[in-house]
UniProtKB/Swiss-Prot annotation:
Belongs to the RcsD family. This is Phosphotransferase RcsD. Residues 803-890 form the HPt domain. InterPro entries: HATPase_C_sf, His_kinase_dom, HPT_dom_sf, Ptransferase_RcsD, RcsD_ABL, RcsD_ABL_sf, Sig_transdc_His_kin_Hpt_dom. Residues 1-21, 330-890 are cytoplasmic. Its main location: membrane. The gene is rcsD. The keyword Transferase applies.
Length: 890
């Protein structure tokens, strides 16, 4: 029992060390309490202000809903009411030019009319003013209403302010600015077709110190301008006294979705943002796209928080000061007292430390001996030193070591040892000896050198073996491929493809050997990157067509960009990576992007992006070690296991590297960074470009394809337009589209799987837009065809047909009616009125048929077909053709 009591007293003793720890714990608790107190006070203040903002938002929303109803009442019932007898006895006073004051018996509200108007507007103003007298009779804050009449474009202002007095000196007063700004806002909203209701930002009435915002509502009237009703809704009576009015802001809500199904959730949502100098508390107004924002400085938050927690905070600070004083006092006292009081824990620690030192000494792979010369005894030694100690004369070893910088060699039992001596810095007459077996180290070094020589020999032998086996396989593989290509059997094509794969693998093995033994040499030539791409595309196009993939070539370099470097190496890199991307992609597309680095014009980046399943981690290891892991495969074969390593090594030979980034299920991006010197521009482009003064209509659905084609054509000097950019009467020379149904006349059909240029109809060609040379050939062929057609059609068109028109006796009627119908075609096409457009085209077709003008009749029939299909680009083209035909007849 006594033993338990003594242990309890020692555990909870009041020694200075224990009291110091208690004070330290108290300081930590007080600091945490202070932080929690401040945080709770700040959160409570923010929560209270958030509730106030929500209440203000509810009040503003209720006011908006009420005055929405009043707006509709004024427009539907009061402004639209016609009472013939009510206009008798009305009187207005002209204050300024186009400014009239309505005289009325009740003076709660006053009304001004701006602009010329009739009696109906005066009567309507009287009714609205009387109605607002009733609504605003008990209000003390200023209210105003603006009514922009769509009938006569007059503006009516009804307000509780003394308008007649304020209007004196109208052009110099603030009322003039307010009325002008309101009229501009209402006219702007009246012209906006997609905006029925809008709100203004928070505004301030200077002489009344009133804050308000404007609710504007538009009412469309057939045959007249839109009518706009605007109310200035004050908020002075909605804001609590402790919140300054100038700190409120009403702004559009960027997060509004437009369908507030849950009204309570929508109105009670509050967001708090901490900016650099202020705190913003905002709440959205339900059924509107606005939100109310209250800005408060950080100083206000700190002052309000300190006022709420001042007494507890002072008490906490006082306790913290006492705890710090006690901690410092008892800490110095405990440090003085423990200097003279021995502790048993020190002895235990020394014992443990000595045991650890003995364990370390016994595990050393060297001999360790610590010798004290004064007492001639060994202080520390391990087994290796104890084994050699009987054969050592430490006195002689010490003397010789002092003469040879502390290092000597000694032979013990025909074994060579190196002995190093160090003098102890703690005990002056104590030496430390380290004994190392030299024979064992020499033997180990010999074995290491022999292993290194054997490794280098094996490496050299492997390289020679791979080179010889590659040379031995190359000739039979080529012979096999040539023989398979000459066969006419049904299986010969498959056999030839497999033979080509074998030849390609042998070539890659030889290239890998040359790169490994550094015997590969670069051949620098001057070449065009675009021409190189035009060679690569046909090589990978069959595999892409076979799998149903889409290929996009996006070359951002200049049209005639010339580079100096190894063309064959770059071609092999692109082929290897694109073939690998085709194999690993089952659906989607493969994109090749070519860019010039912004840092240097001599550095190029080739990016190949696919939409496959991605490359696994094991396949990525093939980037650093050739053919170390298996690769993906499809039903046509396996991906090339040497592609990554060869591409990276060739890119490094070209001064760059290969980078691969992949994501499972999304695809892979292969980035090849190389250095290709740009050719010095000898002569600027002074000559005329290929397609200068040629206008091309590009009707392409895909934005990527449209950008690729537009860049190519503009590099050749053409002007490209789209159906949306084209004017009604604007002509173009060449028509390009990727939709076969849009190719109703001569033009180019763009495709990504065409091997070159193919004729699909008279004056219609199908071309692969990824191949620049094919695109250029197709454009030139189409221009030649169109020039040939123009030579045929330039035969006297107006000869027989003009004579026939004059002989029919209807020439005067033709001149009076047909040009007007052609203008009507342009107008109806601009408004997309297809029904009226069809009637006009049918009427013109009848005129041409009656006069036996067959070309005009055929043009109208084609136009009717395009109208039924709603083909806007085709409609515009044929309207232009009909216009040209009519002008040629006239």
């Amino acid at each position: 029992m006594r033993q338990k009591e003594t242990t309890a007293t020692t555990r909870f003793s009041l020694l200075p060390g224990s009291i110091t720890r208690f004070f330290l714990l108290l300081i930590i608790v007080l600091l945490v309490t202070m932080g929690v107190m401040v945080q709770s006070a700040v959160n409570a203040w923010l929560k209270d202000k958030s509730y106030q903002i929500v209440d203000i938002t509810h009040a503003i929303q209720k006011r908006v809903d009420n005055w929405r109803y009043v707006t509709w009442q004024i427009y539907d019932n009061i402004a639209a009411t016609t009472s013939p007898s009510s206009g008798e006895g009305l009187q207005e006073t002209r204050l300024k030019q186009d400014v009239y004051y309505l005289e009325k018996p009740r003076r709660k509200t006053e009304a001004l009319i701006f602009g010329s108007h009739d009696n109906s507007t005066l009567e309507m103003t009287q009714r609205m003013s009387t109605y607002l007298d009733t609504l605003w009779g008990a209000e003390n804050v200023p209210w105003s209403m603006y009514y922009l009449n769509g009938q006569d474009n007059s503006l009516v202002l009804i307000s509780t302010l003394p308008l007649k007095d304020l209007t004196s000196g109208f052009k110099e007063s603030t009322v003039s600015d307010i009325v002008d700004s309101r009229r501009a806002e209402m006219l702007q909203q009246a012209n906006a077709l997609d905006e029925r209701e809008s709100f203004s930002n928070m505004r301030r009435l200077a002489w009344q110190n009133g804050h308000y915002f404007t609710l504007r509502t538009t009412f469309n009237q057939p045959g007249h301008l839109a009518t706009v009703v605007a109310f200035d809704l004050p908020i002075n009576d909605l804001i609590p006294p402790g919140m300054p009015l100038d700190s409120f802001r009403l702004e559009p809500d960027a997060t509004a979705t437009g369908n507030n199904d849950n009204e309570k959730e929508g109105t009670d949502s509050v967001s708090i943002h901490f900016n650099s100098t202020k705190i913003e508390i905002s709440s959205a107004l339900n059924s509107t796209d606005m939100r109310l924002v209250w800005q408060v400085p950080y100083g206000t938050l700190l002052l309000d928080t300190l006022q709420n927690i001042l007494l507890p905070l002072l008490l906490n600070i006082g306790l913290l000061a006492l705890a710090l004083f006690g901690y410092t006092t008892f800490r110095h006292f405990s440090s003085r007292s423990t200097e003279n009081v021995p502790s048993t824990a020190v002895n235990n620690e020394l014992r443990i430390l000595r045991a650890i030192n003995e364990e370390i000494v016994s595990l050393l792979p060297l001999g360790l001996l610590v010798h004290d010369q004064e007492s001639n005894r060994t202080v520390i030694s391990n087994k290796i030193a104890d084994h050699l100690l009987p054969h050592l004369n430490l006195q002689n070893i010490t003397t010789m070591a002092e003469q040879h910088q502390g290092i000597i060699q000694a032979t013990i039992n025909n074994e060579l040892y190196e002995i190093r001596m160090f003098r102890s810095q703690v005990a002056p007459r104590t030496q430390i000896f380290i004994i190392r077996d030299q024979d064992r180290e020499v033997l180990v070094n010999k074995k290491l050198k022999q292993a290194q020589r054997l490794y280098e020999k094996n490496q050299q032998g492997r390289m020679i073996f791979m080179k010889n086996i590659g040379d031995a396989l190359k000739e039979p593989a080529q012979s096999l491929a040539e023989s398979a290509a000459k066969l006419n059997a049904p299986e010969s094509k498959q056999l030839a493809n497999q033979a080509d794969v074998l030849v390609r693998l042998v070539d890659e093995i030889q290239l890998a050997n040359m790169l490994a033994d550094d015997s590969w040499k670069s051949e620098t030539v001057l070449f065009s990157v675009q021409d190189l791409i035009d060679e690569v595309v046909p090589s990978v196009l069959p595999a892409i067509k076979r799998k149903g993939l889409q290929l996009l070539i996006n070359n951002h370099l200049k049209a005639h960009d010339m580079r100096r470097g190894d063309r064959d190496a770059l071609r092999r890199i692109l082929l290897l990576l694109m073939q690998y991307a085709v194999t690993s992609t089952q659906l989607g597309k493969i994109t090749l992007e070519v860019d010039q680095d912004e840092s240097s014009e001599d550095r190029l980046t080739f990016r190949i992006l696919d939409t496959g399943e991605g490359v696994s981690i094991h396949e990525m290891d093939n980037l650093h070690f050739p053919f170390i892991n298996q690769t993906q495969n499809d039903r046509y074969g396996k991906a090339d296991p040497l592609a990554f390593w060869l591409s990276d090594q060739l890119a490094r030979k070209l001064g760059g590297h290969l980078n691969i980034k992949t994501r499972d299920g999304l695809g892979t991006r292969y980035s090849v960074h190389i250095k290709m010197l740009a050719a010095d521009p000898e002569v600027e482009e002074e000559e005329e470009r290929l397609l200068d003064d040629v206008c091309v209509m590009v009707d392409v659905t895909s934005a990527e394809i449209r950008n690729i084609v537009t860049r190519q054509l503009e590099n050749w000097g053409a002007t490209c337009i789209t159906p949306d950019e084209r004017l009604i009467s604007q002509d173009y020379d060449i028509f390009l589209t990727d939709n076969p149904s849009n190719l109703t006349a001569s033009g180019l059909l763009l495709s990504d799987d065409e091997s070159g240029v193919r004729e699909i109809g008279p004056g219609q060609l199908c071309v692969n837009f990824n191949m620049s040379n094919a695109m250029q050939e197709a454009v030139l062929q189409l221009i030649e065809v169109q020039l040939a057609q123009e030579e045929v059609t330039e035969s006297p068109l107006g000869g027989d047909e003009n004579a026939q028109l004059h002989a029919s006796g209807y020439y005067a009627l033709f001149v009076d009616t047909v040009p007007d119908d052609v203008k009507r075609l342009y107008t109806e096409a601009a408004t997309s009125d297809f029904a009226a457009l069809a009637q006009t085209a049918h009427r013109l077709k009848g005129v041409f048929a009656m006069l036996n003008l067959v070309p005009g009749k055929q043009l109208c029939e084609t136009l009717e077909h395009l109208i039924r299909e709603k083909d806007v680009p085709g409609i515009e083209k044929y309207i232009s053709d009909i216009d040209s035909y009519v002008k040629s007849l006239l």
